[in-house]
């Protein structure tokens, strides 16, 4: 079976400069892979490249068999990115944002179920995102991720902004999703938190994948 994510000598540019300069990575369906490395190593750029948001200019790059160099838009239909930017509209309520993402992804997932799974109570759902605390915004982003029913999750420092209860909830969601066959790439500096969730770890440094460790 072909890997869900396949990168071989993949190069990405930010402006004229290489942000990723020869990435090699294969990820199978249902695997959870931790990307670790120092700030500026290229972890976020790698996630954005897999999401089809940053072009791969050289090398091999396929996601779900789709050539990233030819059709990034087709890839975006199948991935959900949880990053530093929330992807939410401040003037809309949580519920309105989650419904928007369900429609944008043409998903059949129920927004109410996604909000339940993200631990968002009924009263909070009607608050505008611009009025939320950092933790509430993160849960809203989680609900938007869940409702897209994506085959690949790309999580950039996903525990950031969550309290202890929210962190436990996120861990459970990752385990459940992987058990259901969702492929997950997770970038984190919180190694003690993230390592128990993953199948293996990839070191990213200087725009390269330097080492692969079996967790």
Question: Which functions belong to the PLM regions below?
Answer:
Residues 36-38:
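The feature captures the beta-strand-to-loop junction immediately N-terminal to the Walker
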Residues 51:
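Helix-to-loop junction immediately C-terminal to a conserved catalytic motif
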Residues 59-70, 75:
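Conserved ABC transporter NBD signature motif
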Residues 145-146:
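ABC ATPase C-loop
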Residues 153-157:
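Catalytic Walker B motif of ABC-type/P-loop ATPase nucleotide-binding domains
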Residues 187-189:
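H-loop/switch region of ABC-family ATPase nucleotide-binding domains
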